[in-house]
Regions:
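Active-site segments that bind and position negatively charged phosphate/pyrophosphate groups
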Residues: 211-352, 357
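A glycine/threonine-rich phosphate-anchoring loop and its flanking beta-alpha core
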Residues: 110-224, 327, 334
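Glycine/serine-rich anion-binding loops at beta->alpha junctions
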Residues: 86-104, 140-147, 279
Length: 419
């Protein structure tokens, strides 16, 4: 069996103007508004704060969120949340902002040692003890779908590892998805976001089926990531189709309808992977991001080297889907066709290769780095990348086929350069 966890979403141009009344309906009177220093200078935050104040809600802005957040960022946000005596939270920004807000809500409501709630094996993976304060997420990007999920991802600095906190309690009470918020995004951020959407959707579509998982010893212990299931399949296939139809134009010459379609695709993919879960590309991405040396991406404002999440995922994806293609041929074929691959005369068993080739073509067309080499890694880094990634048991076990350590190293070798 599988269960369905569905987020509450409002979608459409101008929906951010309704934030104040939505916050009031959730009982908010004094809220913490989480954002970052880039979004703090943009119209989206002004609209959000004006709407809150118009509804008579007191708000205090926290704009210290780090891009690609760290445990340091989560802890700082949690201190702010604990000291402010807030009765609700609003996040205005991308996945980094929403994830930091989720974690700050958790630790301010239920203080604990930091690693207590963090995923095993790094942390103790303790469940949230009870309900959190209401949280309205207002994304200004469309890749992470953090407004749809109970997941908060961060870099653990001491271990140079990316990990996260997973709990249904973290899922925001409401997401306000306003495509007008996307107009100021840099083209490379749009590209990385779109490939992240694709990866969420395709990994969920090709994940180990829910029918192949052992039932939990108690219904309350059924994980959020249940594997591919009919509910997620519908959302994920549509999300892949929308990315395939809109990605190239959205990067080079976007119209409003392209941005609206991609934000909707991000929402669908978030609903899909929020129930099915991701697998190898995301499992491998954490090491790619966490061990970054000196890569400085075009379009991101950061004072340190980083591999943005969407890029850290997609540089592995062509190699992975070529590898997993034989595990569920029809699903890979469907994904390739939805992304725009030429499938006439091809057979189902070609699905993995067709999908891989189409991804490489679209990566080149949108300026995505050429594999691991393109984000600053050398072949002498592959062993360390493998070691860090193979520990991501939650994601690795969700793959459609077993993966040995040597096979994972082979995937990193195949991801080194594509053209």
């Amino acid at each position: 069996m599988f269960s369905v966890e569905a987020p509450k979403i409002k979608f459409g141009n101008g929906v951010l103007n309704e934030l104040g009344e939505d916050a009031k309906s959730l009982g908010m009177r004094r809220v913490a508004v989480f954002t970052d220093r880039i979004v703090a200078e943009q119209e989206s935050l002004t609209i959000a704060v004006n709407s809150l104040e118009k509804a008579g809600i007191e708000c205090e802005i926290y704009d210290e969120v780090e891009v690609e957040p760290t445990d340091r960022s989560f802890k700082a946000g949690s201190r702010f949340a604990s000291e402010g005596k807030f009765d609700g939270f609003v996040s205005v920004g991308g996945g980094s902002v929403m994830d930091t807000c989720k974690a700050s809500n958790l630790y301010s409501c239920f203080p604990s040692e930091f690693l207590d709630y963090v995923n095993a094996p790094i942390g103790k993976a303790k469940p949230a003890p009870g309900p959190l304060k209401p949280h309205i997420a207002c994304p200004t990007t469309f890749g992470t779908a953090s407004e749809c999920t109970g997941i908060a991802i961060f870099d653990l600095l001491d271990m140079e590892a990316k990990t996260g906190i997973v709990s249904p309690r973290l899922r925001p009470d409401l997401g306000l998805l306003d495509p007008l918020s996307l107009k100021t995004l840099h083209p490379m951020i749009r590209a990385a976001n779109a490939f992240d959407v694709f990866s969420h959707a395709c990994e969920s579509l090709t994940a180990r089926p829910f029918t192949h998982r052992q039932a939990p010893d108690h219904p309350s212990r059924r994980p959020l990531s249940q594997g591919a299931n009919p509910y997620s399949d519908i959302a994920c296939l549509e999300a892949i189709q929308l990315v395939g139809e809109n990605l190239i134009q959205a990067v080079h010459d976007p119209e409003d309808e392209n941005l609206e379609a991609l934000m909707f695709a991000g929402m669908l993919a978030g609903i899909g992977f929020g129930n099915a879960g991701c697998h190898l590309p995301h499992g491998m991405s954490y090491a790619v991001a966490g061990l970054c040396k000196d890569y400085q991406p075009d379009g991101w404002s950061s004072d340190h080297a980083l591999v943005p999440h969407g890029i850290s995922v997609i540089v592995n994806s062509p190699a992975v889907f070529r590898f997993t293609g034989s595990a569920c041929e029809e699903r890979h074929f469907q994904a390739a066709k939805a992304m725009g691959a030429e499938t006439q005369g091809a057979s189902m068993e070609d699905g993995g290769s067709l999908l891989s080739d189409q991804l490489i073509k679209m990566m080149k067309d949108t300026g995505i780095p050429n594999g691991l080499q393109g984000v600053g890694y050398g072949r002498d880094d592959l062993e360390n990348l493998t070691e860090r990634s193979y520990a991501q048991k939650r994601l690795i076990d969700n793959a459609p086929c077993p993966v040995s350590r040597e096979q994972m190293k082979g995937l990193f070798e195949d991801s080194f350069s594509y053209w």
